[in-house]
Amino acid sequence: MKEKVVLAYSGGLDTSIIIPWLKENYDLDVIAVCVNVGQGDDMDYVKTKAIKSGASKIYVEDVKEEFVVDYLYKAIKSEALYEQDYMLGTSFARPLMAKKLVEIAHKEQAKYICHGCTGKGNDQVRFEVGVKAQDPTIKIIAPWRIWDIKSREDAIDYAKKVGVEVPVTKKKIYSVDRNLWHVSHEGGDLEDLKNEHKEDMYFMVTPPEKAKDEPTYLEIYFEKGAPVKINGEFLNPVDIIDKLNTIGGENGIGIADIIENRLVGMKSRGIYETPAGTLLYAAHKKLESVTLDKYTYQYKKLVSAQYGELVYNGLWFTALREAIDAFVDKTQENVTGTVKLKLYKGNIKPCSVDTEYALYDEGISSFGESELYSHKDAEGFINLFGLPCKIKALKNF
């Protein structure tokens, strides 16, 4: 009996040609695994294609709700970003995929896990560190670090040679990653920084100048930091993301053209569509500004940056990530309420916040007198607060 390899399978260019390559070079029984995180593919077609390409078996794991509840809700609560811009759509999906690959490898008693990540990218790190953290005995096969194929053009030529159909041409050669949270576009003419990216590549977002000519008002209700209602309607987690993707997309919201510093050293350019995430982060940030005290709010910004870097670097299965999640959950205890947004041609304007946990007090914050605060109190505070500056000035006077 042949030994088994579990392949992270998408049906795209790289994983389509890996099946015949594995059989040709390793003589392994290939078990394909497609983890459905909302990439929008025809899963019946993916199943058929995997078998036609030479896989002995194909698993399609629908984990969309798990992806939202156990991963994206953590993104929203933490407002995690990498380098202040990237909303980590790929990064949050990879640990869940790694988890499912290991589960199926155990079920199939497979000694190997294979992925189609490029040797220059971050995903190879995320997959392999994720696998090692769960089962250090599983061996990894990474074709892009081994085979003679050096470019996506070479990969297309190899696909034609072995008779594997691929949904990519040499004319339009973007590498696309899609899930519930985002769509990313890399490669092709994007690699020349002098090129403006082409708006016809968008999957989810209408270009802002072509978006609706009238504003859209949107209400999002959060409960302990997680979104549960849209415009007053309770929705399940997956439907919330889908609905916000639609609303944000038709209003031209959620496009980012980013130059990022990859974990492996080089810079890369990506075009990201994240309409739901952009709306949720904007609303969540507004609600936190009202419900968190000053020091928690400011410290959480530091933690959010660290959290984003951890997730980006593939360190999901770590004690630090779990500890940060525990801290974030504590901060979210009173992050409950409704935020109203006004959307227009790529812009988001927060309109109002309605929450019983507001730390904002109109009476204290107004310019008039208050039982808790007198204008006269400011004089003593200023004298003490400014004392170090005054002493230094006196010494140097």
Swiss-Prot record:
Sequence positions that bind L-citrulline: 86, 91, 122, 126, 175, 184, 260, 272
PANTHER family with a match to the protein in the record: ARGININOSUCCINATE SYNTHASE
Taxonomic lineage of the native organism: Bacteria, Bacillati, Bacillota, Clostridia, Eubacteriales
Superkingdom: Bacteria
NCBIfam families: argG, PRK00509.1
Subunit structure: Homotetramer.
Keyword Ligase: yes
Organism: Clostridium botulinum (strain Okra / Type B1)
Pfam families: Arginosuc_syn_C, Arginosuc_synth
Residues given in the record as L-aspartate binding sites: 118, 122-123
CDD domains: ASS (cd01999)
Binding site for ATP: 8-16, 116
Record's subcellular location: Cytoplasm
GO MF term list: argininosuccinate synthase activity; ATP binding
The protein's name in its UniProt record: Argininosuccinate synthase
GO cellular component: cytoplasm
HAMAP family (UniProt xref): Arg_succ_synth_type1
Primary residence: cytoplasm
Catalysis: reaction(s): L-citrulline + L-aspartate + ATP = 2-(N(omega)-L-arginino)succinate + AMP + diphosphate + H(+)
PROSITE patterns per the UniProt record, alphabetical: ARGININOSUCCIN_SYN_1, ARGININOSUCCIN_SYN_2
Pathway connected to this protein: Amino-acid biosynthesis; L-arginine biosynthesis; L-arginine from L-ornithine and carbamoyl phosphate: step 2/3
Enzyme class, spelled out: ligase
